[in-house]
Amino acid sequence: MKVMVISPKNKTLFNFRGDLIKEFISQGHEVVAIGPDKEHIEEVLALGVEFIEIPFVKDNTSILGDIKYYMELKKVIKLQKPDLIFNYTIKPVIYGSLAGYSAGVKRIYPMVTGLGRVYASKSLKAKILRTITGILYKQAFKGCNRVIFQNSDDLKQFVELGYLPEEKAVRVNGSGVNMERFNANELPNQPIFLMIARIIKEKGVFEFAEAAKMVKKEYPNARFILLGGFDKSIGAITPEELQPYISDGSIEFPGETKDVLPYLKEAQVFVLPTYYREGLPRTILEAMAMARPVITTDWPGCRDAVVDGINGFLVQPRDSINLAEKIKFMINNPEEVQRMSRNSLDLCKEKYSVDIVNKHMIEIMDLNKNRSI
């Protein structure tokens, strides 16, 4: 069977979907991957896939760009004749599903990996875009077999908005985490709090920095490490805006890295005060796999992985004072940190291992090698 994977960024093909693609291939399926450019092409091809480049405009208001993307997808789908399409994130989900259905593909399984800024913002522009996007989602989902969601909030919201019937929606536990790579190790004694994210406002970067500033006045030995790259999207934080927190010693900022493992090993607690509408943050799962307690927000996706008081804490979005309080609790209660550490690992083994998640994905798409075609 030929499986087509439609991606918004080449990097996600091996970072987030690599294990799933390998599972497709191990089940005896041919995989064609579609991405927007030739970035990271060596890593993509190393998965054992055929790669096709179809650029698209990331701007939500580029109507002509979207039409061109849809037409190119339809053209390639007609030529490739895939048996099944697996597509993820907003534009690949909408236009990949519409193009696939129009081209006669009988099995289409889009995955909603979060709702993005459009569904989190209260601006007039966001409201208009939500209306347009909703119409497109509703039309796109008509030709799909199942629609896969990564958290319960997104699934519930789309069903309540009438984008799809409840029986067509199914939830998986995020993208899963490779527990052989992210394996548990001992917690350090020093209170080291790590945040990994793109440097944008909605990820809670300022809340992390402000909380760090407050806590360090009382606990100067505590360390706060922010890991991630600067971004050019709406809501991006500039180096100049971040610099005061670095200069006064509130946070350490190593920048972006290809390997987060050494930083997770060094950290005692993982922190992600996000209010961005993503599916289920992969960084939270990686921290849990390494037996790290997590402080995150009471927010879609985050509250699926973290049980308040069990494997970490849920704080209010945009609230650096609430965040600082929970950080201080972790510093003052090392035995609770140890307990939450064990619970994080147990929860990850039970629900979020990539093997468990991928098995569920294969079952949803009915791609077991023993299936009779």
Give the ranges of each region predicted by the language model.
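Nucleotide-activated donor-binding/catalytic signature segment of Leloir-type glycosyltransferases, i.e.
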Residues: G228, I237-T257
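A short, well-ordered alpha-helix in the C-terminal region of glycosyltransferases
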Residues: N322, F329, E336-K351, V357-E363
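Acidic donor-binding loop of glycosyltransferase active sites
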Residues: K265-G279, R292
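Glycosyltransferase donor-sugar binding loop
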Residues: G35-E39, I196, R223-I237
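Donor nucleotide-sugar binding/catalytic pocket of nucleotide-sugar-dependent glycosyltransferases
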Residues: I52, G134-N183
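A conserved mid-protein helix/loop that constitutes part of the nucleotide-sugar donor-binding site
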Residues: F14-N15, D19, P191, M195-M214, ...
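Conserved acidic donor-binding segment of nucleotide-sugar-dependent glycosyltransferases
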Residues: V307-G309, F313-S320, F329-E335
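Short hydrophobic beta-strand element within catalytic cores of glycosyltransferases
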Residues: P293-T296, V306
